[in-house]
Amino acid sequence: MANEAHNIEHTDPEFRDDSADARTLPLLPVRDTVLFPHAVLPLTVGRESSVQLINSLGEDKTIVVVAQREARVDSPQPSDLFAIGSLAVVHKVVKMPNQSLFVFAEGLERVRVTEYVQLNPYMRATVETVPEAFPPKSAEIEALQRNVLTLFQQIVTGSPTLSDELSTVAMNIEEPGRLVDFVASSLPSLSTKDKQEILETADVQIRLDKINQHLAKELEVQQLRNKIQSEVQDRVQQTQREYYLREQLKAIQKELGEQDDSTRDADELREKVEAAGMPDDVKKEALKELGRLARMSPMAADYSVTRNYIEWLAVLPWQKSSGAGEIDIPKAKDILDEDHYDLQKVKDRILDYLSVRRLKPNMKGPILCFSGPPGVGKTSLGKSIARALGRKFVRISLGGVHDEAEIRGHRRTYIGALPGQIMQGIRRAETNDPVFMLDEIDKVGRDFRGDPSAALLEALDPEQNNSFRDNYLDVPFDLSKVLFITTANQLDPIPEPLRDRMEIIDLQGYSEEEKVHIAFRYLIPRQEEENGITKDMIEFSEEAVRRIIRHYTREAGVRNLERNIGTVCRKLARRIAEGKTEKLAVTPQTITEMLGGEKVRVDTEIAERTKRAGVVVGLAWTPAGGDILFVEATTMKGKGGFTMTGQLGDVMRESMQAALSWVKSNAGKLGIDEEFFEKHDIHIHVPAGAIPKDGPSAGVTMVTALVSLLTDKPLRPLTAMTGEITLSGNVLPIGGVKEKTLAAKRAGVKTIILPSENKMNMDEDLTPEQLQGIEVHYVKTIDEVLEIALPSNKAEEKQDARTRAEVLNEVPAV
């Protein structure tokens, strides 16, 4: 519910609208206590809404304090509160280390809540004063008042906890109604219900009669306590004083036939513990803590800590599984195919796991790690696996987590301690075998608070996680039935011991054809539904989708593609809302109108920049997928200097030195004057200077750039290359072949030069459809690279000029 007014009225039988001094004030719900007029009450304010209420008070510190009907309700609604409370003024606010507040509030007068005008972020209500019925002075009133004083003095005198000053204060109060309020607020044994009943009693004579009854009962309890004390004193040692006092309280309650809230809490928790199906050692620990709770006062500092701990133990799914039954492999395959296009290797590995799981249900599950660029479906694949298995899906993001306690929890000695994210996820799942996704595991940080990745070692080790021990719970929990799935954009930041525990499954980028299929099968229907558009209102042509892919996105995944499709759908929704159209056929021209000018230059960028000799296109791998990389070389008069710029790493700088050495040693064969290097300086630059770059795979690109510059031969149009070189001129294999190839295709490259040893990777990772329109050359030496990348005669140079002009639309095709 937002900050909207709610006309919520109490239907209390004693409600009377007989006051005209209505006020609208902040309302503070309290539990296990009642604030009386003229009494000062210390309150611990911990709920977020209550903290916001106190912090919002300005110069006017007046609030309304109302007791809850049930103390266990954490987020009370108007129906959970009594109708009568106290108008109060806040005198002092102390901030506690655990972000809660310690507030001193003084009651002013009784008020009745007539209407709640606000529920969030905190309650505000209209209240009116409850007038007190003052009977005329009479002998009966005088007798009741004196009896109250007498009984109260006897109780204070016989109580080891009540101060004698209370009797003195009570004797100095002449007004009978105020005396009753003082006595009621001073008796710790009076229940919240009884205190509220006295607060709601406007007639002073009736109020005197009620407090007399409670005092007589309390005095009887006190006398009985003294009797019990004499019976048990010989059996209790001085070192067991706290236990002895709890026994007294239990014996008193037994004699009176009463049971307080704490006893009821203990009984309810005991039932939950018995029904939770805990292992014997865990149940023993829970019952031990229950015994402590039963002997503890609800006002004790450790009461809520112990209660929360037992509740956590009781609600965890110790024996509760998903009950999905036997795994249906054909159905699982259909679900994976329905949710994701292609990804055949990934699906095969998942189906292999499910098949083994069907044959051996108690097998230790592998830890799968989906590695790949953003937007390729890593997280959604985890959801599909959960659906195929018929299990709950839980996801937590580890990006930016620096504290080890986020994984394993805080110890109970800390204020506000809670279990870690893993056990909280298990509780949310309500089963002990969910599919548990740890997202962005490569972005876990570390600092002085610990290393979260080290805390994951136990949880992600199938040999150890059958007894995972959270710091807060401090009892073993079996995680062996959980199917853990992690995701990462790159594997290098993941510590080696953690990476060793996971089975890496690469999810590589999509080709244009795959993106088209994904757009029509998943993205367009989803965006139509999200934007309230039916299939009859919009029709995307394949050419329009391809235009978005080529000229408005350059990515390995499909997030920006979906974002642009969503933009088109929203603009159509606006046209329909304005009555301008009822149906739209989306064509390439429509895309330009709705999305503006082209954001990505395909073909033309490469053709334009490689017109000059010395500029060559390389291929690079990035965590977001592959990309093209321009390498530029230039020369000037000098003394043989060699400059390298572009935020280059050490490995890349060494590749440049090797490239220059090879060119110098083969200058004669290449037709380059050997004295040229002594009289000129050479500068190699890799643009996008703000982006760090490293790796050996640009070696062939640098050699080609130098030879192109020194022989004045521009790179052949729409050609790109990758490969590591040696000083002897051999071309060595590189990694990330699929990502680099798909990046080249996205950029409009038509010819790719690759090391011959990478042919096997191309055959395994790429389909003929993905390679359609691309000519791939596999080379073993740098001589083969130069033969393909640079024109060898005037005829080829003229042909290259015509091809480049066609791409740039500079001259008609010849």
UniProtKB/Swiss-Prot annotation:
E.C. no: 3.4.21.53
Listed GO MF terms: ATP binding; ATP hydrolysis activity; ATP-dependent peptidase activity; sequence-specific DNA binding; serine-type endopeptidase activity
Record field: catalytic activity: Hydrolysis of proteins in presence of ATP
Active site: S697, K740
Stretches assigned to the Lon proteolytic domain: 610-792
Induction annotation: By heat shock.
HAMAP family: lon_bact (MF_01973)
UniProt protein name: Lon protease
Family matches, as SUPFAM superfamilies: P-loop containing nucleoside triphosphate hydrolases, PUA domain-like, Ribosomal protein S5 domain 2-like
Pfam families to which the protein is assigned, alphabetical: AAA, Lon_C, Lon_lid, LON_substr_bdg
